[in-house]
Amino acid sequence: MSQNDAAPGQQLWTGRFTEATDAFVERFSASVQFDARLALQDIQGSEAHARMLAARGVLTEAERDAILQGLAEIRQEVVEERFPWSPQLEDVHMNIEHRLTQRIGEAGKKLHTGRSRNDQIATDVRLFLREAIDTIRAELARFQHGLVELAEREADTIMPGFTHLQVAQPVTFGHHMLAWYEMLERDRDRLADCRRRLNQCPLGAAALAGTSFPIDREATARELGFDAPTRNSLDSVSDRDFAIEFCADASLILVHLSRMAEELVLWTSQQFGFIELPDRFCTGSSIMPQKKNPDVAELVRGKAARAQGSLVQLLTLMKGQPLAYNRDNQEDKEPLFDAVDTARDALTAFADMVPALSVNRERCRAAARAGFATATDLADYLVRQGLAFRDAHEVVGRAVRYATEADRDLAELSLEELQQFSTAIGDDVFAVLTLDGSVAARSHVGGTAPEQVRAQAQAARERLA
């Protein structure tokens, strides 16, 4: 039996061996159960390689055409989920090459000329990750669009800003949504930077030292949409920085979403009551009929652990390897795939859910009023009256203690009561102590004043355009 028609268990590299691979080792070392996900990228790289080999005279035009036709048929099998994957053939590369040779005969055996699985997998993963980054950046932008719309809708809605989860100063709900937007904007920028760095083509590096065939790496890189070939053949097959960098970026995305999720969970609770999530994004309890649980937000918060786990897996995987390809690197696919899926799905969930929430404006305003949120405004007022800030801070602290004992807000104290703490306080102080006056006073760039929120939202729209 020729190797082209190899029975399951007879790999395409058996010429040097005198006994068959142990059945357990075949199962243990096979990766096709997960790297089959790279099939379309593998075919794309093979098509470019075949065209380049023909252009350089390594393949005849007839061989090139047969290979391209065979690969097109295999692509259709993959897309239609009819491809006969075999774990005995180890990985996505050997499965596709074996299938190609079955279909077109001798020409299929020539496709691997001037190429190794080492540069092949490095190319496949870069192609895959480039597409994944484009998809994730699009979901980030979609979520950002939703946040901008929500910010504009709630530009005048006053809520408490917190430090240490204690009421600090009044802000607007729209301002808070634009803070989320900025977190995602940094994420989009980081992914664009990651994409730029990974967009170099390793194909042609072969096993580690390059190839003696007269290949044209620039042509292959151009056809595959890369900016240029990689510069060093040894580094080309050794490098997994781009995968680690992506997982770091994905981890940051999930950290940001997790922080948002924590706030959403708090805000939906009866103790806060700031927002209501649509029923379609919540679940109930098997025992408590009154429950409406923010499960989507909680799951996103939990999935941050998965993304961080993927990053640690890859860092640990690479830390002790000598240069060039080592079989350890087979283990890079699953954490990378999981990081891609986790980031994409979490963003999709939030891009759908968050813009659809409803805000309880009365509860938000009442919470801001209840926590002496305008105390800093009173201190600023006293500074404008000539007090040093530290003295003003002391005065307001005593006034807050007095109001707390009286179970009243600062704005509910009389002028006479306020003046017992400082004679610099005049009757114009009450405009300062209102929630609306507090947020309106912060009308500088980046401030929480409603007109600034609208201006920031418009600028955000323009950046997304």
From Swiss-Prot:
NCBIfam families: argH. Its main location: cytoplasm. PANTHER family: ARGININOSUCCINATE LYASE. GO terms for biological process: arginine biosynthetic process via ornithine; L-arginine biosynthetic process. Keywords: Amino-acid biosynthesis, Arginine biosynthesis, Cytoplasm, Lyase. It holds the Pfam family Lyase_1. This is Argininosuccinate lyase. Belongs to the lyase 1 family. Argininosuccinate lyase subfamily. It is found in: Cytoplasm. It comes from Halorhodospira halophila (strain DSM 244 / SL1). InterPro entries: Arg_succ_lyase_C (IPR029419), Argininosuccinate_lyase (IPR009049), Fumarase/histidase_N (IPR024083), Fumarate_lyase_CS (IPR020557), Fumarate_lyase_fam (IPR000362), Fumarate_lyase_N (IPR022761), L-Aspartase-like (IPR008948). Pathway: Amino-acid biosynthesis; L-arginine biosynthesis; L-arginine from L-ornithine and carbamoyl phosphate: step 3/3. It comes from the Bacteria. It catalyses: 2-(N(omega)-L-arginino)succinate = fumarate + L-arginine. GO terms for cellular component: cytosol. One of its GO terms (molecular function) is argininosuccinate lyase activity. Its EC number is 4.3.2.1.
